[in-house]
């Protein structure tokens, strides 16, 4: 299905709005701190919507479509393994609270303060290389999504030359994201990502109701029941033939989520942007509510497409989808484009335009954030540490913009030439492991263990990156391209002939192995180094090192996780109440409203986790019929829909309040040209190199 003029008008309006806002935000960007971290002025609602959009991305939508198309509702069941982990990480402020206390603008700046300058440079190089390789496929996947969804031709003729449509679509999307980023840096990114986030939330709800009008709930279930018995889209305990996205996948991902929490620097500007550590913590907590509407998109849209492709009454639409897919030679790209192509057959004019605009918004919000992050990391953590003298503000901003432009050029070229040979999620994991393999140990150890040493950091990061690169080479180069020839050349080699046709480990499994090895080496080499304990109060700006602009009382180890100062002398009731809040992670910075949000979040996530545990026990011991599972999924969708609608309205109000506060604060803020992410010699806590 091709787009109607109404659809193009909707897309054009969105693009004009984004560019207009970006030009207006340029006047607010007056310093390096503005460009890198929004001058640390963002509130919770602004953060949770903008950062959520930065992490969404058209490529993430495509990856989720792959996952839920293959595993169906059952993927949501195993995904509940992640629920308590996300809850604990968000509610405790794990990593993000202490990281914000360090006042570092990039993670590698924290590495220099905590470990050494040489390690900062090494970690910055790894983060940059891992990041641009990971980001390198974004433009291509996004462009293909738009091409097949909008029904654009695969090739176009320009001056007699036949060119793939992929290139101009990628160029357009990258140019748009680049314009937003270069104009206003992190300030423009926060503002435009927030507005795009609100737009996406609304479009998701509209899309859900329109699709439900096309395919009823009963028809949806009928279509899902046509899946093979051992690849059920309804019953999570009948998935013996499901490819990749099974229980083992989610268990490993659960561990990696803890290990690498906030370690990935694709949106590093948001880590430094909160106005206080408490606002950063609340933004993470509110993310659960924001995610409800996104869950509707990720889970239900691919299931509607699955039903359409299997129900006889949609045979015409299914034939059109299959005809388009048959023209795609690469089997992995064919898998990725099945759902986008199917969605184009289900939505009417107008809604098609809204959905296309949503995909473009998701793409731009991720592109501008990643361009900003990897370009900034290259300058701040690779180039700047080599300089003996700081750059002027103007030269520093110019260098940042040049680096960001360079990242965009690399992504464009890489997307044109790299042949993606596995699921998007798997590629994310293994390319991310080049940096994340060791970074999780280095970050958590650096923030929470005073005996973590620079030797342990070097060991974890070095070994982790080597193992990850080895995994990428084995799976994507040696196994598919060299192993078949080796088997032909050495037919008598038994061990060579015994090797499987495909590499036995996927990207997630390899990432898990890398993380375990890195943790072991961080602990081992830190203990062997026998360095004196690090001054954690100085690192975290506590007690005599407290910084006034946090706008709160100095934090101690007890108050960080919620020690409310009510003692026995204040009465047994107050003492018990204080102990209760302490145990669930509430501190003095929480208002009554914050506490209500916090408790609801705990209750909501706990309900679904215990339902998962009890349901799994019943399914294994007694068994649950498909009819029982269908009732559960109906209940889940209804609850998700209610929260999705409510949170969209709630965050619309709170987000615009934060947006106006941000603009007001930036207009009156005093800029400090020395606040540029550099580290002075007296700030080093270990080596003075």
What are these regions (language model features)?
Residues 53, 76-182, 252-260, 269, ...:
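Helix-loop-helix module between adjacent transmembrane segments
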Residues 36-104, 244-261, 267-313, 324-330, ...:
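Membrane-interface helix-loop-helix modules in multi-pass membrane proteins
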Residues 2-3, 7, 66-81, 140-167, ...:
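Transmembrane helix-loop boundary segments of multi-pass membrane transporters
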Residues 210-226, 288-338, 416-420, 477-489:
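Extracellular/periplasmic helix-exit of transmembrane alpha-helices
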Residues 478-633, 645, 654-689:
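Terminal cytosolic tails of multi-pass membrane transporters
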Residues 10, 89, 126-138, 199-213, ...:
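Selective recognition of specific alpha-helical transmembrane segments in multi-pass small-molecule
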Residues 113-121, 132, 162-168, 373-422, ...:
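Loop-to-transmembrane helix boundary motifs in multi-pass membrane proteins
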Residues 21-28, 131-139, 143-155, 165-168, ...:
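Hydrophobic alpha-helical segments and their helix-loop junctions in multi-pass secondary transporters
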């Amino acid at each position: 299905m091709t787009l109607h003029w109404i659809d193009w008008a909707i897309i054009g309006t969105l693009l004009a709005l984004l560019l207009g806002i970006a030009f207006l935000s340029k006047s607010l960007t007056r310093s390096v701190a503005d460009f890198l971290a929004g001058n640390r002025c963002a509130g919770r609602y602004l953060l949770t919507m903008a950062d959520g959009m930065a992490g969404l991305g058209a490529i993430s939508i495509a990856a989720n479509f792959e996952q839920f198309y293959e595993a169906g509702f059952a993927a949501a069941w195993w995904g509940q393994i992640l629920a308590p982990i996300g809850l604990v990480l968000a509610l405790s402020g794990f990593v993000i609270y202490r990281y914000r206390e360090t006042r570092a603008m990039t993670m590698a700046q924290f590495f220099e303060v905590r470990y050494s300058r040489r390690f900062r440079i090494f970690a910055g190089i790894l983060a940059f290389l891992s990041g641009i390789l990971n980001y390198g496929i974004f433009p291509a996947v996004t462009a293909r999504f738009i091409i097949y969804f909008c029904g654009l031709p695969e090739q176009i003729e320009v001056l007699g030359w036949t060119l793939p449509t992929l290139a101009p679509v990628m160029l357009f999307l990258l140019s748009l994201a680049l314009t937003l980023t270069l104009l206003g840096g992190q300030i423009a990114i926060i503002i435009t990502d927030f507005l795009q986030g609100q737009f996406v939330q609304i479009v998701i709800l509209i899309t859900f109701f329109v699709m439900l009008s096309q395919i009823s709930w009963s028809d949806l279930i009928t279509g899902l029941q046509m899946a093979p018995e051992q690849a059920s889209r309804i019953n999570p305990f009948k998935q013996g033939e499901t490819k990749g996205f099974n229980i083992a996948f989610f268990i490993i991902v659960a561990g990696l989520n803890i290990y690498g929490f906030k370690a990935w620097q694709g949106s590093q500007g948001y880590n430094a942007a909160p106005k206080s550590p408490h606002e950063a913590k609340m933004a993470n907590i509110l993310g659960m509510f924001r995610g409800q509407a996104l869950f509707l998109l990720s889970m239900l849209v691919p299931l509607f497409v699955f039903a359409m492709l299997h129900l006889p009454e949609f045979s015409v639409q299914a034939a059109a989808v299959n005809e388009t897919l048959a023209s795609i030679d690469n089997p992995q790209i064919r898998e990725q484009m099945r759902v986008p192509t199917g969605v184009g057959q289900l939505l009417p004019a107008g809604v098609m335009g809204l959905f296309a605009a949503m995909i473009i918004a998701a793409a731009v919000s991720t592109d501008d954030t990643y361009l900003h992050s990897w370009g900034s990391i290259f300058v701040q953590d690779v180039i700047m540490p080599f300089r003996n003298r700081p750059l002027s503000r103007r030269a520093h901003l110019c260098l940042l913009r040049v680096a960001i432009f360079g990242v965009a050029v690399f992504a464009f070229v890489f997307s044109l030439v790299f042949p993606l040979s596995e699921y998007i999620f798997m590629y994310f994991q293994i390319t991310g492991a080049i940096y994340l393999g060791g970074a999780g140990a280095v970050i958590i150890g650096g923030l929470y263990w005073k005996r973590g040493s620079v030797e342990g950091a070097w060991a974890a990061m070095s070994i982790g990156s080597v193992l990850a690169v080895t995994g990428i080479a084995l799976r994507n180069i040696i196994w598919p391209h060299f192993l078949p020839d080796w088997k032909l050349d050495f037919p008598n080699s038994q061990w060579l002939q015994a090797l499987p046709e495909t590499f036995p480990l996927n990207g997630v499994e390899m990432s898990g192995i890398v993380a375990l090895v890195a943790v072991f080496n961080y602990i081992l080499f830190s203990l062997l180094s026998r360095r004196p304990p690090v001054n954690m109060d100085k690192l975290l700006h506590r007690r005599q090192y407290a910084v006034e602009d946090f706008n709160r009382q100095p934090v101690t180890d007890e108050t960080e996780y919620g020690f409310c100062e009510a003692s026995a002398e204040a009465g047994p009731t107050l003492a018990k109440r204080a102990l209760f809040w302490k145990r669930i992670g509430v501190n003095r910075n929480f208002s009554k409203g914050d506490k209500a949000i916090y408790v609801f979040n705990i209750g909501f996530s706990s309900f679904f986790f215990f339902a998962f545990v009890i349901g799994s026990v019943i399914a294994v011991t007694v068994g649950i019929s498909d009819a029982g599972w269908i009732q559960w999924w109906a209940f889940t969708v209804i609850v998700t829909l209610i929260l999705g609608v409510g949170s969209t309205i709630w965050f619309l109000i709170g987000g615009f309040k934060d947006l106006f506060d941000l603009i007001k604060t930036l207009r009156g803020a005093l800029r400090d040209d020395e606040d540029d992410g550099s580290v002075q010699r007296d700030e080093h806590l270990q080596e003075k190199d």
